[in-house]
Structure formats: C-alpha cells, structure tokens
C-alpha cells in the first residue's frame, strides 16, 4: 500500500516490479499447498524493488537513501529534535504545542475530541508517554529505538504498525494481542473474518501458521480461517466499515448500510481511532506527516477497481489511513464498491430511487426519470424496472377503480401518440440541414426569413388539403369536359383553358350532389362556404397560437435577456462526431457569440445630444419621404386600375391583362430598394431597429396597394355587370401572384448576380451586398395576403402558392450562398419571427377578413356561374340552411352559435381587440421581468464585489500574521513541499489561501 501513489504512474507497465498484473501470475501458486517462491517482486526478499530489502533503491527504510520516505533525521529535518521548526522541539517558535506560541491553534473543547488522542484533526499533538510524538516513548514512530520503527537498524522493511494498540507494541498490546479477542484469527470460536482495506498486502495472510495452511485460499478469494464458511453469505460483510462508530464517525459508506453486520464485524472497533476528513479542517490540510505509519498488516479483500488495487482510505475499510484521507483519486462517494453501469439499480441508492418512483403518477414519474443524470439506455431500463415493480404491487393491493384505470390508459395512450406524432413531424421536417447551414454562415437574422418561408409553406399545404378534399374532389364527380384549347399562354394570363376548370369560382356547380336515389346528398353551396370558412378560421387560430408561442419563447422567458452565456458555454454536443456536423456546429457557436457580443456593445453605447438631434432629423426626413412615395404609388395604382377596365374592353390582345400586374410588381420591387437606401442616411446603431423600420415602411406600402386593389375589385369589377365577376377577380389575383413570383426570380438570378459582378470586379469598394431581410419578408407577406383574398375566388391558389414557395426557397438559398455576404453587424433575430407573424396577422389577415366579410355579406353573386348563382347574397345560403335547422330541435345550438358569433360582423374585430389587449398585458409582464432580472444582476455583481473586498482584507491579515510569525510559515512551507513530493501530480483543493501564497512566495518558479 505504501507504494500505491508512488508507483501509480507505472501500474500499466507489465515489466514494472510493482505492476498489478504480476500479482495475477502468482495466483496459481497461492492456490496450492506449499507453493514455491517464484522469482519475482512479490516474495523475493532480494528483489531490488521489494520493501523488505534494506538495500533496495526504492526502500523506504534505507537509512542512507536521500529520497527515502522514512522519517529523515538529517540537519533541519522535521524529525530532528534540534530542528527549529520541528513539532517535538519544545523551544521551537512555531511549535504547536507551545502554550506561549501566539499562532497556536486553539484546541477543540468538545468531549469527543479529548477522548481520541490520535484524532488527526487535532491541532495540538498529545505529549503523554504513549504519544507517538513523544521521542522518548518506545512506541513512538519518531523514536529510533522502537522495534517496529522504520529507522530501526534491526528491523528493516517491517510493515508492523507502531501506533498504540498494534501487535508489535508491547506496551499497548491492543486487541490483536488478545488471543480470545473476537476478531482474532487465533480465536477459533469466532466466526468473523478480516477485511483487507488495501490491495498491496498481496494476499499474504499475517496470522501464525498461514504458510502451512493446507488449503490456501485463492488470491483475493474466500477466507481460509476456521468457521469462515459460516459467514460467507453475509450480505454486506466485505463492503461495510466494521468499527463501532462508523455511522457517527467518518463513514464514507452508503446511508442505507444494513444493520446486520454491526454486531459481527467488531475486530477493529476497539482499535480504530476517529478521524476527520482533511478537507474538513483547514489546518489539517497543511499537515504532511502521517500520524501512523503505513505498514499496517493487512489481509485480502474483494477488489473494486479496474486495476486490482484497493484505494488507500477507501470507504468500507477497517482502517483509514489519515495520510490518504481526502486525496484525489477514483474514490466513490459511497461505501460499496462501484457496480457496473447495467447493475447500478441494484445499489442501495438505485433501490431507493425505484422505491420513490413507484408511488408517483405516470406523468410525475416520467418527469423524474427524465431529470435523472443518466444515459438514455439507463433511463429506459429504470422505467422498465419501475413499471415491473409497480405491476407486481398492483397485483398485491386492491384493484383500482375502473374509471381511474380508464383515465390512466387514455392519458398513457395520449402521451404515446403525442410523442409518436412529434417524432414523425420531426422526421419529415423540411430543409433541416439547409437551415442549419444558413444559420451557421449568415446568422439568425437571415435564418428567420427562411424559417418564415417554411412556416408559410406548411400553412398552404394544409389549406390545399382542406380545399382539395371538400371542394375540388366533389366537383370532379360532376364536372363537364373542357372543350377549350390549351396554348401555354394560360400559365401567365390565367384565362382561356383555365377558365373552365376547378381553378376558378365560376366552374363549380350550385346543385346538390347525390349518387343514386338513396345515396347521401352533398350541398356544394354549404361545402364551398364552410370549407373556405374553416380554412380561414384554422389560419386565424394558427396565427394566434404561433404568435403566442413565439412571443412567450422570445419575449417573456427570462433566459432571452441573460445574454445566452450559459448556452454558449455548455451547449457543445459531444455526440456529434461527423466532421461536417462539427464544423457546422462551430460556425453556429461563433455566430451566436458574435451576435451576443454585438448586442452587449450596442447596449452600452451612448450618444451625445448633438448626435441624437442629427439622427432624429434624419429619421424625420426619411419617414416623410417614404410616406410620400407610398402615397404616390397608391394613387398611381388606383388610377391605373380604373383605366385598366376600359383598356381591356378596347384591346383584345391576351397580353393586355398583364399591364396592371406588371406595374404593381415594378412598384413592389423598386420602392423597397429605395427604402433600403435610407439606411445610409439614418445609420441605426442596432440592425434590429433598421429592419423594424424597413418592415413598417414596406408593409404600409404593400398593404396600401392591396387595399386599393380590393376597393377596385369590390366596387368596380363586382358592379360592372360582367358575366362572372368572381372569376375575373380570381384571374387578377392569379396574375398578380404569378408576376410577383417572376419578378422575385428575375431579381434573385439576374439582379443580385449583376450586383455581385459589379461589387467584385467593377467597383470593388462596394463589395458583396447583404441580404435584405425586410424586403424579402414583405414579399412573402404580400403574396400570402393575395392568397387569402383569392382563396374564395380561386380555390387552387394555396396549391399554386405552395409550388412557388418551394421554388423560391431553393432560388433564394442559391442566390444567398453565391451573391451575399454575412451581415457586417451580427445581431440576434430571435424575436423577428414573432414580429413577422404579427405583421401577417395584423394588418394582413385582418384586412383579408374584412374584404371577405364585405364580399359575403354585401355583394350579390353572379347569376350565371358559381355555386351561389341565383342568390341575392352569398350569405343567403347560410340563412336558408339555418332556417332549415331551426325547425329541428336537435340543432338549435348550431343556430345560436351562428346568430351570436358567426353572424356578427364585429365578432372578429372584438376578438382581434382582445388578442391585442392580452398581448399588451404580456408585454407589460415582460417589462417587469426585465427590470427584475436587471436588479438581480446588479445584486450578483455587488455580492461579488463584497467577496473580493473580504478576500483582500483576509490577505492583508494573513500578510500581517506572516510578518509577525515567519517561523511558522517556514514549517508550513516545508510540510506543503513534502506533501507535494509524496503526492506529485495530484491536486489538493483543500489548501487554504495562506499555504498557497507561502508556496508561491517560497518558490517563484511555481
């Protein structure tokens, strides 16, 4: 054991004398009677590395070896009584036993401390005759006349302990000298056996007659003394400390140690002193000398670690060497040896955890298991074990109520289906890898645009599935064959062949579809209006839910305002091993770090009054100019729309219908570029503010244009007396949507590419451009608004928009990677998605609801086309259906819902107002949390300053103490250096501030 730490670095070498693997070679000899002494380091006294060889280079008992670990007695040695700093020198200035020493540590006054003269944490060494520190005492470890001393010339290499109570101490024989002691091996009537706390005993028994034992036990195997077989089935015999005060003293064992072995293993209870941990006493960490020598006679015990060595001072040992208490090493926190990963639940802690999980509900049990710091496999095994134990208990107790069992099964099935659905949705999620690449290279600001595009794509997929299932498929069953010729120009104009298809409102029938005389009927009027209403209602609640979710995640949660430092420090996933994935993760981390640092820098920036005045003036000028440009564009669109109807009557060219969409698309492309140039004048410090301003200006422009067009459609086209004005409006919306898509593609592949050529080759000072988030996001909002308006007049618009968004994602991604550079000012866009959805909800979606409400409640449908032909208003189809339901008592609740909710035009406006009020309340809650977080942050900073002040005061007091008592620091310095020599390469975290400062000052190279 004494060579454990000294030879720890060489235990992996099979040729090293103390290599643990060499011990296994002798196991075959140990199992035989009278086995011969094989040449090796274990039992060869002449081997150079053996402990009993007095001339061994590594022997601790070699008196002339300068590096010996025995007690040195050279001048200025700690064991030399003439040394000024020794503890046994009564006249030493630093003597801790000197009552006049000003820095003498006070002695604890509790009774238990006085009853243990060998208590290691005692600051005052006992000087009674039996004390080890008394050099005149024969049993003292510092006495050279002691028979078992390491420095005794006639007893080299003895491993017999020299503390009082050891076998070779005649004055204090202890319990081992008593042949009738219950724990003695010479007492054949006792059924106990010894426990070896260390593995360095090499399996050699130390009782008399061990060499001639007929049946020598195997190495580290079963005990061989008489009556040992009776106790082989004791559950915790080899793993518990056997002294009497193990539970109240210094016990490293488990808190649930069985009580069955307390009365059996009592051999060491009478000789085991009480020790405190090194880290419990700040002064005890400075003592480098061992109160007891290391040569304790030991027997074998079951090994727990992978090297075959029991750790010195390991829990469960009968004797704990205070020299190794608190040392760093693979020592477990519990007394039992460590179990394998698959058998951890068999430990007392695992059984306790299982017992605590059984009475929990299913939801609480899942949360508790999920919070366990274990691997997924261990969590699954734990869940299976708990379910198995719970099923066993349920058979023993009374059966639960039928309703409770039903509710539990329903909740369990719901959780499983929810988890399965979540896994399926995650597996089919689009563009996960592409989005990670975009976020890693361009940051979260650019990534927010592509996330918004994907969200809109999912939205349109749902709308198309709904329309296709309840409107288009039933119409296919009664549709007539289209006799018009397809030329290909219909893709751009939307007229001709597409007019007599399911694409437009005028193609649908107004009759009730019924197959057979006794088959169920299908009312197309109700199906058409209810499907459109269900689609818009679903969009409404989806927008509310998404906006609330993003608002909660990005505004209310306090971790958003913590700077993300914790995430940046602890976010690395060590399961990522693929090279590309690792590089992508590194890019994401570096981008997030730059975003956090830029925000911290921008928050701390302050401007002077003149700078604020200049910027405010620039902002006012930019807003006036942008508002004037938007008003001029809206006026131009209005006059062009009024002229367009007359223009189409006089021109029969199929391309004439593209005039209005072409002009509107040119305005939508050119004006946002002009708005983006205002950044050169405004110069916002925070890029987020710049994006917000551009979004507000662009949304004002685009929604104003859409409002002008809606006014033109509802007041000019609807009242123009055309044969099917609903189809004309649907064709106009289709052309606007298609033209906007074409302009976006041309701008991506041609305009942005030309800008890249100019910036890289012609005018290099311009460089690559940055991605304009505001302009691109408003293109998506503009297109989606047109889709919602046109879904009533063109049910296939969600499908068309779905294809356009799919193509636009890849085109924007290619253009982004080729023609753009990352933002020069990195900033976090975690709140951008919330703002995008809010703009999509208001004013976009609310404006759509107003437009469709006016269409349904105020306008007369065409008399010769569409499902509502012949009705005075679109809503009259609902009125007639409600009148039919009012005659049936079972459907009166439907009548009430319609008349009080759906029939009220103001219902949607009231609901929108409620949402805005709730949003405002949440905003105020968020502001209050911001203030609280700021106050707590300041409190943490102040507490840190207070601690630094106290540390400085403590350092000053220690410096004053050092100047007043320099000799005590010399002693402590030598003790620390000796500890560093004995435990080289280990970190001792229990050194106090004074010892560390003394070591640094005494050894400047350190």
From Swiss-Prot:
Membrane topology: Multi-pass membrane protein
Cytoplasmic side: 480-485, 547-619, 676-698, 754-786, 857-900
Annotated Gene Ontology cellular component terms: extracellular exosome; plasma membrane
Chain ranges on the Extracellular side, renumbered to this chain: 1-458, 509-525, 641-654, 720-732, 808-835, 922-1006
Subcellular compartments: Membrane
Region (Disordered): 1-289
GO MF annotations in UniProt: mechanosensitive monoatomic ion channel activity
Pfam families for this protein: TMC
Polar residues bias: start-end ranges: 20-30, 50-59, 76-101
Main subcellular localisation: membrane
Transmembrane segment boundaries: 459-479, 486-508, 526-546, 620-640, 655-675, 699-719, 733-753, 787-807, 836-856, 901-921
Keywords: Membrane, Transmembrane, Transmembrane helix
InterPro entries in the cross-refs: TMC, TMC_dom
Residue ranges with Low complexity bias: 138-149
Keyword Membrane found: yes
Compositional bias of kind Basic and acidic residues: 239-250
PANTHER family found in the cross-reference section: TRANSMEMBRANE CHANNEL-LIKE PROTEIN 5, TRANSMEMBRANE CHANNEL-RELATED
Family affiliation: Belongs to the TMC family.
Function: Probable component of an ion channel. Molecular function hasn't been characterized yet.
Record-given protein name: Transmembrane channel-like protein 5
Source species of the chain: Homo sapiens
Gene: TMC5
